[in-house]
């Protein structure tokens, strides 16, 4: 059973990295103006989406006891869009009117959180491996 979990965590880590890489490749094709515009009230700007998904991963890590020390300039709590228990919610129609996060902030934040997620998965994987002996 431990080997199955070990293999699953390795596979999950690879899939996470691949998905995040592909998403970034798609995002990198956008011009700045295209990344921050909100075409309709029911859809978020691509830049917002890029940062919000990272915020979601951050919250999932914290739920599992990971202490994340973000640099002050990366305090992106306003990316909460659904979860009232976390804090203030910026409504979907307003996201395109809110000039933050900048694309640079989104990419830095995303990179920071990606490293945290991969570290978390590797730690879990190492713990599974230790259980084999």
Regions found by a protein language model. Give the residues of each.
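Aromatic-glycine hotspot motif
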Residues: 1-47, 54-133
């Amino acid at each position: 059973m431990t080997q199955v979990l070990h293999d699953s965590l390795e596979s999950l880590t690879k899939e996470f990295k691949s998905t995040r890489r592909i998403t970034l490749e798609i995002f990198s094709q956008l011009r700045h103006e295209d990344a921050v515009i909100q075409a309709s009230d029911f859809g978020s700007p691509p830049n917002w989406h890029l940062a919000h998904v990272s915020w979601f991963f951050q919250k999932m890590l914290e739920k599992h006891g990971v202490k994340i020390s973000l640099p002050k300039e990366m305090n992106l709590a306003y990316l909460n869009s659904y979860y009232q228990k976390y804090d203030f919610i910026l409504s979907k129609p307003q996201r395109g009117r809110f000039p933050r996060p900048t694309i640079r902030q989104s990419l830095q934040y995303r990179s920071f959180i990606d490293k945290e997620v991969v570290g978390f998965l590797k730690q879990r994987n190492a713990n599974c491996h230790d259980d084999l002996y």
